[in-house]
Amino acid sequence: MSKEQGTKRPAKKATLVVLVRHGHTPTTGRILPGRAKGLHLSPTGESQAKKVAGFLGDIKGITTVYSSPMERTIETAKPIADSVGVKVRRNRGLIEADFGTWTGRKLSDLRKLADWKQVQNNPSGFRFPSGESFLEIQSRMSKTMTEIAEEPRGEIVVAVSHADTIKTVIATALGTPLDLFQRINISPCSVSPILFGSSSPYVLAVNSTGADIASLLPKSM
């Protein structure tokens, strides 16, 4: 074995990505808004955004706050960015799922469709009519997480996105089959920190809405 072959490569520094779902909106739990423009946070959502910004503001070392380009995510990301002294960076990879012709429909109506059972029980084989498939959503989010974690390594970053997109990231990180990802719950303004290192991702918490978020993080960060 040559000296070059025997030399160990230094381990990559881990990047902590703190995933945050946007706050409550007037359509939360009632309508599938998708990528429809003009949806803003409700007063409840604004309060949630300020609250999570206060929690994350206690974390030392956050260098970047990314956001999906949707209004509701930007309005959630802005207080967080202000609390740590940075600007919001829009990242289209974090955008809401494209629900196609289901966009804007009432959830109560969608639950009556035969396709709804597949969305809940076999999402890996489902594509929203004229929209994305769940496999495409998962692939897009995995690519986005890789890009964020590499730019640069060893930092703490916040990524504000949406329920289903965040759920696919958590499922991938845990090695959970996509057909089981609906068992994951992501509440408005909940926090799910994931450590991306040189080996497998390490999920520190899922759907956390408590004040002691900083205690979940590795002491070395």
Protein language model features and the residues they cover:
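Active-site signature of alpha/beta-hydrolase-fold catalytic machinery across serine-
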Residues: P79, T168-T172
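Active-site-proximal alpha-helix that buttresses catalytic centers in soluble enzyme cores
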Residues: K3, V20-R90
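Phosphate-handling substructures
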Residues: H40, D82-S142, L195, Y202-N207, ...
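Acidic, low-complexity terminal tails and accessory targeting/binding regions
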Residues: M1-L16, G61, R90, A97-S108, ...
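Short, hydrophobic/glycine-enriched beta-strand segments
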Residues: L16-H22, A159
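Short active-site segment of divalent metal-dependent hydrolases/proteases
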Residues: T25, T165-I166
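Generic structural signal for well-ordered alpha-helical scaffold segments
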Residues: K50-G57, Q138, S142-E150, I170
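Short beta-strand scaffold positions
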Residues: S67-S68, S139, V160-S161
